[in-house]
Design a protein with these regions (language model features):
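Bacterial Sec-dependent N-terminal signal peptides
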Residues: 1-22, 639
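Acidic, contiguous N-terminal accessory segments
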Residues: 6, 18-112, 287-289, 296-298, ...
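Flexible, acidic glycine-rich loops studded with aromatic residues
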Residues: 305-444
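Extended carbohydrate-recognition surfaces in non-catalytic/accessory domains of CAZymes
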Residues: 429-495, 552-564, 572-577, 633-638
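Aromatic-lined ligand-binding clefts that engage carbohydrates, nucleic acids, or primary amines
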Residues: 490-533, 594
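An acidic-aromatic loop/edge-strand motif
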Residues: 545, 555-638
C-alpha cells in the first residue's frame, strides 16, 4: 500500500518517465525504475577530465535523494542538468539553479548520453533587427535546455554595424544606419563579453559573424567607399584587430566572415586577406557556402541547394548544414516537421568533414515588436525537431519528403507523429511563456484534386498545412497562374458542435514581403475559400474569416521586396494564419467534409493551404482540439 501511495503522489506532482518518451532530445541510454521515486535533496556535479566520457557526453545516476551528474567538461554537466530538468518538471529559465530541483520528485534512473554532432547551433540576425541583451540571454537559456551548443551571432548587415567601434566611432553613428532599423543601437564590448560568458556557463560557444564584404550598405554610407576597396580593407583590418583585442580567443575561438551574395573584382584576394587576419588572431574562420572562395582551413556553412549538392563526400573542407534550417522561410508548421526529419549533412553522425547544423533566423523585413519575432517564425517549435536530429543523429527515415508531411504507413510518418506527442508535452509544460503557435497535425489526411492544363489530377497529402508548390512538384509539374487545387478531408463528430481551426492560404516569408497580402474584407487571403458539408444532408456552408480585417487588401506584393521600401513595413499578426484568431467551424453529427479551394493567383514562392483544428486556452495559449476523427483520403479508403 505504501508503494502504491508513493506512485500516486509522484504522478500527481509530475509524471515520471517510462523510457525516454517525453525527453527532447532523447537520451541514447536511459534505464529507469518508475516504481521507485524519491524527493531530490542534493545535486552533485562531477567533472572528471580523465574519465572515458567524450566531450559533451554525460551520465546521471540517482539514489536516496542524491542526483549525481558526471561529465568530462562543463558542457556535459549542463546537458545533464537539462535532461534532469525535463525528468522532474523544471523549465528553461530555472534549470541552471539547484534550488529549482530541491524537493522535486524523481524516478530512480541511470542515463548515459552523448551527441551525434559537435555543432548544434542557432543563428540570430541582430544586424537587421537589434535585440536587447535580456532577450538574448533568454534565448541562450532555451538553447541550453535543448542541448544546443553554438550561438551564431550575426552582428552586422546592411542596416547597421552592431559592434562598438573605438577606432571608427562613426560606424555606430545613427545617421549612417538605415532609418527605422534601431538606429544607434549596438553592443558594447562589455556587453559582448558578458553574453559570451553567459553562453559559456551554459555550454554554448558564441560564433560572432561580421559579414564581409557583402551585406554592408552601412559601410559604404559611412565611409563613401566599399569594404572590398583598398581603403575599405584598410578600415576593415583595424576593425577586426580591435574586435579580437577586445574579445580574446579563449572567449571567441571562431569568427564568421560571411562572404555570400556579393560580387567583387578580386574574391580570392579579399578572402585570403580576411582569413589571414582571423588566423593571426588565433581564431578559426567560417564562411557561407556558396560564397566567395575560401581556403580549406575555413569551415563552410551550407545555405542553399547549390551548397547542399556540392557538400558531402569529396567536399574539400569541414562544413555545417544550414540548408534546411531557415526559420524565416516557408511555413512554421511545415518547417517543424522538416527540421525533425532532415538528415544533417546527409549522414547519421559526424565525420571528419560533417560537423552538424545551425538553425537560422533571418528577418530581412523590419520588426516593430521584437516579442513577435519568435512566434512569427515558428520558434521554439522549429527548435525542438532540430534539437532531436542534431543531438540524436539523422536517421534518414523512409518516406521523409522535403516540404511535405510523410504519408501514412511510412517510417517517417510513425516517427513524426510520435515526436509530435513530445512537442505537445513540451509546449504545455516547459514553453507556456514562449507563445508556441503549434499543435500536432501530421496525421491530417487530404484528398487533393488539381486542375492543371485542362487535366484533373487526384492525389493525396498529409498534415494541417500543405505546401501546394511541393504537391505539384511531386506530381511532375510546376503550377501556373490560373491553376486550381482543392483539398478535402472528412471529420467525424458524435454530435452537432462548433470547433475552432486555423485557416490560411498564404505563408509569406519573413525575409520578403512577397505575397497576395491580406484578403478583401470578409474574404480569405490569396483567393482561398472554405466549405463545410455534412454527409447526412448534402448542404454546404462557406466559412469566412472570424472577424473583419484591420487592413483589408494591404501588403499585396507579387515580387520579392528585398532592399525595397515594402521591407520596412513590419508584419502584423493577421498576415500569418497561425497568429490569428481561429475560425468557427460548425459540424453536424456524423461525417463532415472540409474543402479548401486554392486558386493560383500569381507565381508565389510560397503557396500553402492550412486547416488546423485548435483549442484556444484562457491564458492565450493553444492546444490540440480533442474528440475529432479524420477519415483517410478516398484514394486510400472509401471512408
Amino acid at each position: 500500500m505504501k508503494r502504491i501511495l508513493t506512485l500516486i503522489i509522484s504522478f500527481l506532482i509530475w509524471p515520471t518517465i517510462t523510457d525516454a518518451q517525453l525527453l527532447i532530445p532523447e537520451p541514447i541510454n536511459l534505464q529507469s525504475d518508475n516504481y521507485k521515486t524519491f524527493k531530490i535533496t542534493k545535486i552533485v556535479e562531477v567533472i572528471d577530465t580523465i574519465c572515458r566520457l567524450e566531450p559533451e557526453a554525460y551520465a546521471i545516476t540517482t539514489k536516496n535523494g542524491k542526483v549525481t551528474l558526471t561529465a568530462s567538461d562543463r558542457a556535459g554537466i549542463v546537458h545533464a542538468r537539462a535532461t534532469l530538468a525535463q525528468l522532474v518538471g523544471v523549465g528553461p529559465e530555472e534549470f541552471m539553479y539547484d534550488d529549482a530541483f530541491i524537493g522535486k520528485i524523481a524516478p530512480e534512473t541511470s542515463i548515459a548520453d552523448k551527441p551525434a554532432f559537435p555543432v548544434r547551433g542557432f543563428m540570430h540576425d541582430t544586424g537587421r533587427n537589434f535585440r536587447e541583451i535580456e532577450m538574448l540571454e533568454r534565448e541562450l537559456d532555451l538553447l541550453a535546455f535543448y542541448k544546443l551548443n553554438v550561438f551564431h551571432w550575426h552582428l552586422t548587415d546592411n542596416p547597421a554595424w552592431r559592434i562598438e567601434c573605438k577606432a571608427y566611432p562613426q560606424l555606430n553613428d545613427p545617421q549612417y544606419q538605415r532609418k527605422g532599423r534601431d538606429e544607434g543601437q549596438f553592443y558594447t564590448y562589455d556587453q559582448i563579453r558578458a553574453i559570451i560568458e553567459y553562453a559559456q556557463s551554459r555550454g554554448i560557444t558564441v560564433i560572432p559573424e561580421i559579414d564581409m564584404p557583402g551585406h554592408s550598405q552601412y559601410f559604404d554610407k559611412t565611409f563613401g567607399f566599399s569594404m572590398a576597396s583598398k581603403q575599405g580593407m584598410a578600415v576593415l583590418k583595424v576593425c577586426l584587430e580591435e574586435f579580437m583585442e577586445e574579445i580574446p580567443a579563449e572567449l571567441c575561438p571562431y569568427i564568421h566572415i560571411g562572404s555570400d551574395e556579393v560580387y567583387i573584382s578580386d574574391p580570392h584576394g579579399f578572402m585570403q586577406f580576411c582569413e589571414d587576419i582571423i588566423t593571426k588572431g588565433g581564431r578559426t574562420a567560417l564562411a557561407w557556402y556558396p560564397g566567395l572562395p575560401s581556403s580549406e582551413n575555413t569551415i563552410s556553412q551550407i545555405w542553399s541547394d547549390e551548397g547542399r549538392r556540392a557538400s558531402g563526400k569529396g567536399f574539400p573542407r569541414r562544413y555545417i548544414d544550414s540548408y534546411m534550417g531557415y526559420l524565416n522561410l516557408g511555413n512554421p508548421i511545415v518547417n517543424s516537421a522538416n527540421f525533425f526529419l532532415h538528415q544533417l549533412c546527409s549522414v547519421e553522425s559526424a565525420d571528419n568533414k560533417a560537423m552538424g547544423g545551425i538553425l537560422c533566423l533571418w528577418n530581412d523585413v523590419r520588426v516593430a515588436d521584437k516579442t513577435k519575432t519568435f512566434p512569427h517564425n515558428g520558434m521554439p517549435e522549429g527548435l525542438l525537431g532540430f534539437a532531436q536530429s542534431s543531438w540524436g543523429g539523422g536517421k534518414g527515415y523512409e518516406g521523409a519528403r522535403t516540404d511535405l508531411f510523410p504519408k501514412l504507413g511510412t517510417e517517417a510518418y510513425e516517427a513524426l507523429t510520435a515526436f509530435e506527442k513530445k512537442m505537445s508535452y513540451h509546449r504545455d509544460n516547459f514553453l507556456k511563456d514562449w507563445n508556441m503557435r503549434w499543435v500536432a497535425n501530421a496525421s491530417t489526411p487530404w484528398e487533393v484534386s488539381i486542375s492543371y492544363q485542362e487535366k484533373d489530377i487526384i492525389t493525396e497529402a498529409w498534415g494541417g498545412c500543405v505546401d501546394l508548390n511541393a504537391v505539384c512538384r511531386e506530381n511532375g509539374f510546376t503550377a501556373q497562374v490560373g491553376d486550381n487545387i482543392c483539398l478535402t478531408t472528412k471529420i467525424h463528430v458524435e454530435r452537432d458542435t462548433v470547433i475552432t481551426a486555423w485557416v490560411g492560404f498564404d505563408s509569406p516569408s519573413r525575409s520578403t514581403r512577397m505575397s497576395d497580402g491580406i484578403g478583401k474584407q470578409g474574404q480569405w487571403e490569396n483567393g482561398g475559400r472554405v466549405f463545410v458539408s455534412c454527409d447526412n444532408n448534402q448542404t454546404s456552408t462557406e466559412i469566412f474569416p472570424p472577424k473583419p480585417w484591420d487592413e483589408p487588401e494591404a501588403y499585396r506584393y507579387h515580387r520579392h521586396t528585398w532592399h525595397q521600401a515594402p521591407n520596412e513595413l513590419p508584419y502584423t499578426d493577421e498576415q500569418f494564419f497561425w497568429m490569428r484568431e481561429p475560425a468557427q467551424i460548425p459540424l453536424k453529427a456524423g461525417w463532415n467534409a472540409i474543402s479548401l479551394i486554392c486558386p493560383r493567383l500569381f507565381n508565389a514562392s510560397n503557396w500553402h493551404a492550412a486547416f488546423i483544428p485548435v483549442k484556444q486556452l484562457s491564458d492565450g495559449n493553444i492546444s490540440e482540439a480533442n474528440g475529432l476523427k479524420f477519415s483517410k483520403p478516398s484514394s486510400l479508403s472509401s471512408q
